[in-house]
């Protein structure tokens, strides 16, 4: 059987680092590479990460600071009115 059945995308690490850590990495990477919605134009699937914490939308060209693995963090959801000012 394949060694990536349980750990999925983190199977690229092979047998290194232990199964528990690879399962945690799997959860993080699945969130990072899942299709995200742009907070400016609302288009889903065109958001990508430029660098750590910097996200951009291919459709509208907007760039914003977010989390390292998610374009919008939990704290940003709570304080969205304060963070985004027009």
From Swiss-Prot:
Q: Does the keyword Transport apply?
A: no
Cofactor(s) for this UniProt protein? Zn(2+)
Q: Which GO terms describe its molecular function?
A: large ribosomal subunit rRNA binding; structural constituent of ribosome; zinc ion binding
Q: Which GO terms describe its biological process?
A: translation
Q: Name one Pfam family in it.
A: Ribosomal_L37ae
Question: How, per the record, is the cofactor bound?
Answer: Binds 1 zinc ion per subunit.
Specify the domain of life of the species encoding this protein: Archaea
Q: Which Gene3D superfamilies does the record match to this protein?
A: 2.20.25.30
Query: Which residue stretches are annotated zinc finger (C4-type)?
Result: 38-60
User: Does the record bear Calcium in its keywords?
Assistant: no
GO CC terms, sorted? ribonucleoprotein complex; ribosome
**InterPro entries in the record:** Ribosomal_eL37/eL43, Ribosomal_eL43, Ribosomal_protein_eL43, Ribosomal_zn-bd
Q: Which UniProt keywords apply?
A: Metal-binding, Ribonucleoprotein, Ribosomal protein, RNA-binding, Zinc, Zinc-finger
Please state which protein family the record places this protein in: Belongs to the eukaryotic ribosomal protein eL43 family.
Q: Which HAMAP family match?
A: Ribosomal_eL43 (MF_00327)
Q: PANTHER family of this UniProt entry?
A: 60S RIBOSOMAL PROTEIN L37A, LARGE RIBOSOMAL SUBUNIT PROTEIN EL43
What's the protein name? Large ribosomal subunit protein eL43
């Amino acid at each position: 059987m394949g060694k990536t059945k349980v750990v999925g995308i983190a199977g690229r690490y092979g047998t290194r680092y232990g199964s528990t850590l690879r399962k945690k990495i799997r959860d993080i990477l699945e969130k990072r590479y899942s299709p995200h919605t742009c907070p400016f134009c609302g288009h889903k699937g065109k958001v990508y990460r430029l660098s750590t914490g910097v996200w951009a939308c291919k459709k509208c060209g907007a760039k914003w600071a977010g989390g390292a693995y998610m374009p919008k963090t939990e704290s940003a959801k709570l304080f969205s009115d304060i963070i985004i000012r027009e």
